[in-house]
Amino acid sequence: MSINPHPMDLSELPEIITSYLRAHKARDLDAAIECYTIDATVTDEGRTYNGPQEIEAWLSRSASEFTYTIEAIGATKTDDDHLDVLHHLEGNFPGGNVDLHFRFILRDGKIAQLVIEE
């Protein structure tokens, strides 16, 4: 296993991540939740959400709090289960635009952990 991330093409992302990103962008909560393990965690803005109910509430809130566009602009991979997808967001949130890392840890073909940070 390599400990240093290396660049990868977005077309090479695992299907579970592309499915999640598609659902997230479309604001399809049911499809997005299906991508997570039963004990998954999401950390966003320093707060951690545990399990499907908290993650669904977070997704619902984040989808309605601001209007924004989101576009994947790059990806790196440490190993098959540790991936980082860089996104550019523009919208009516404070600052108006930001690049955010979506750092995924996969387990058994699903998302076990997602950390979103600058």
Report the location of each language-model feature.
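Short, low-complexity N-terminal intrinsically disordered segments enriched in polar/charged residues
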Residues: 1-30, 34
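A beta-strand edge to alpha-helix "cap/lid" segment located at domain peripheries
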Residues: 2-7, 56-118
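Hydrophobic pocket/interface hotspot
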Residues: 20, 32, 40, 51, ...
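Structured catalytic/translocation cores of nucleotide/phosphate-coupled proteins
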Residues: 20-23, 27, 40, 112, ...
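Flexible interhelical turns and helix-capping residues at alpha-helix boundaries
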Residues: 25, 40, 44, 93-95
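A solvent-exposed, acidic/Ser-Thr-rich amphipathic alpha-helical stretch
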Residues: 29-33, 38-74
